[in-house]
Amino acid sequence: MFIKKDKLRYTSGCADKHPDELPGVRKKSFILPFAGGEIWFEHLDGIYQYTELSIQKLRRDTAIFRRPSSPGYITFVLDETIITEQLISEIADALIKPGKQFMRVAFVGADGLSCKKLKKILYGHGFAIKFFDGIEPAKEWLLNERNI
């Protein structure tokens, strides 16, 4: 079940913090060995309404997760981040541009409207996509070849 993200919920708790001090900005994205494979976790969570910071972090990490040696399985963790049209466009560009073929892409924490927009943009580009409420089910789906 997807619930529309309440913008006030994500702005009230971080109003007193400088954007560079947010946990989501400091959190590193990484490769996780799991069930005999590897998954790239792109952590864009906890950045709240600071879309430009989310995009900057995504652009820095794109150079890493698009390397030929990087995993073809990727999870975008978007909890506690306002998902804007601009962020959706940046995610799509990172996944679609030539040079790296992804096998499966999971999204964790996306609201219903963002899910629809991402599906519309990413459908038919040669990789499976699915949306989850938590990281554990996303990990299981990414590396379970029977669930395509």
For the regions a language model picked out, list residue spans one by one.
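Amphipathic, Lys/Arg-enriched alpha-helical "gate/interface" segment within cytosolic domains
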Residues: F2-I148
